[in-house]
Amino acid sequence: MKFIVKLFPEIMIKSETVRKRFAKILTSNIRNILQKYDEETAVVRHWDYIEVRSKNEENREELIALLQRIPGIHHFLEVEEKPFTDLHHIFELTLADVAQQLQGKTFCVRVKRKGKHKFSSIEAERYIGGGLNQHIESAKVRLKNPDVTVRIDIEDDKMMLVKARHAGIGGYPIGTQEDVLSLISGGFDSGVSSYMLIRRGSRVHYCFFNLGGVAHEIGVKQMAYHIWQRYSASHKVRFIAINFEGVVGEILEKVDNGQMGVVLKRMMVRAASKVAQRFNIEAIVTGEALGQVSSQTLTNLRLIDEAADALVLRPLITHDKEQIIAMAKEIGTDDIAKSMPEFCGVISKNPTIKAVREKIVTEEGYFNFEILESAVQNAKYLDIRQIAEETEKEVVEVEAISVLSENEVILDIRSPEETDENPFKSDTHEVIQMPFYKLSSQFGSLDQSKNYVLYCERGVMSKLQALYLKENGFSNVRVFAKKIH
């Protein structure tokens, strides 16, 4: 099994030195991700593409899914490589492979060639296409908009028949740009803005300001872990949680109602700047979009930026909500975001849309900044991979089992895509599919006389959700420790 990975076009037009560096980093990223899943995967860098090989055909679908989510890959070709002796031999190999596929279809042949041969790419296309047309009676040649395009790459004495072409997410490889710190709230905007910086080549660390207790923190951890696992697992990143309840309480008590929103955001960027300085991070990322809420006017954004000691990046600044939600659906964070409450917007009943610097400074003069300093000093710093380990400690009262009792129902909390791909089947027990992001709103409607065993692929989400349900008074939950294949 072989894949030919093509780099993002913006990489290819850079100078030779920069292109080599980017390609080298992308090769390393691909290797880091694929070899966690398949240790025998080989990743080799060439001048204008990266070659991925695996002997384990059963891993094909998973390798394709992983490659589709690695930043820096424009597209990749799934190919079958064979040696050949001459042009007629290429035709014979192609005929044997595509004869069944071309029955009753229109087709054309496209050839890309490298090395010294007695024929050109166009001559190869004509010869192979003509031969296929003669030998497959029900097939017809059509050069424009054919049903099937037969793609062949020829390099020296080997031909590669392209079996499929898969799109990547493009962008730059992670590590080609500097690190950033994303202020993640668990909503639509912060998840998408984090992804956009990942796609642009930055390693994204996450800073979360907890305004809503344990349940809020668990939800945000789910989103950060989801984004990291899907799009940036080639790199270690940090998750920083800062308890901001004291800061919010001080603002509610001391600050004029209309100025609360801007003051809260200024406190957040101050705290984030201190965290960024600690790790030599030059920029913080927010999900703000111009005019979306009252604090996001140009005047207010400028005043918020003045409180920051780091560059503030706003990748969504010109996006509307529909675009942001559509992007959230693409990256798989929309359902998590739907279940997330928005705390920042509710602390001020009549927020100002055009804050005045002097008034903001006056209001902040009433604020006890020792509370902010204390919140930053007591922040929790995690390697994002520790979310799973932390869950082990936090969910000590939730039993993990591998054998089911009679009165237990399996609650498959994976996403619909995962359950469609690899459904959980049981001949002896009822299986209910309820994605983890719907548990908070729908678990209570289940028959509470039964016991529920939560299942997910790696056990992280099931444990986080078990903790959430326990926090909310549900004692009839356990975690299924067994994996399905």
Curated annotation (Swiss-Prot):
The entry's ATP-binding residues are L183, I184, K265, G287, Q296
Q: Pathway, per UniProt?
A: Cofactor biosynthesis; thiamine diphosphate biosynthesis
Q: What is its EC number?
A: 2.8.1.4
* Disulfide bridges in this chain: C344-C456
Organism in which the protein naturally occurs: Haemophilus influenzae (strain PittEE)
Work out whether the entry's keyword set contains Zinc-finger.
no
One GO molecular-function entry: tRNA-uracil-4 sulfurtransferase activity
Active-site residue list: C456 (cysteine persulfide intermediate)
> Where found, per UniProt?
Cytoplasm
Domain Rhodanese: where?
404-483
Which NCBIfam families does this UniProt record tie to the protein?
A: ThiI_C_thiazole (TIGR04271), tRNA uracil 4-sulfurtransferase ThiI (TIGR00342)
Family the entry assigns: Belongs to the ThiI family.
Keywords of this protein's UniProt record, alphabetized?
ATP-binding, Cytoplasm, Disulfide bond, Nucleotide-binding, Redox-active center, RNA-binding, Thiamine biosynthesis, Transferase, tRNA-binding
User: What task does this protein carry out?
Assistant: Catalyzes the ATP-dependent transfer of a sulfur to tRNA to produce 4-thiouridine in position 8 of tRNAs, which functions as a near-UV photosensor. Also catalyzes the transfer of sulfur to the sulfur carrier protein ThiS, forming ThiS-thiocarboxylate. This is a step in the synthesis of thiazole, in the thiamine biosynthesis pathway. The sulfur is donated as persulfide by IscS.
Domain THUMP stretches: 61-165
Show the catalytic activity: [ThiI sulfur-carrier protein]-S-sulfanyl-L-cysteine + a uridine in tRNA + 2 reduced [2Fe-2S]-[ferredoxin] + ATP + H(+) = [ThiI sulfur-carrier protein]-L-cysteine + a 4-thiouridine in tRNA + 2 oxidized [2Fe-2S]-[ferredoxin] + AMP + diphosphate; [ThiS sulfur-carrier protein]-C-terminal Gly-Gly-AMP + S-sulfanyl-L-cysteinyl-[cysteine desulfurase] + AH2 = [ThiS sulfur-carrier protein]-C-terminal-Gly-aminoethanethioate + L-cysteinyl-[cysteine desulfurase] + A + AMP + 2 H(+)
Q: Which Pfam families match?
A: ThiI, ThiI_fer, THUMP
Q: Which residues form the signal peptide?
A: none
What are the record's GO terms for cellular component?
A: cytosol
Which Gene3D superfamilies does the entry mention?
A: 3.30.2130.30, HUPs, Rhodanese-like domain
GO biological processes: thiamine biosynthetic process; thiamine diphosphate biosynthetic process; thiazole biosynthetic process; tRNA 4-thiouridine biosynthesis
What's this protein's name?
A: tRNA sulfurtransferase
Question: Which enzyme type, at the first EC level?
Answer: transferase
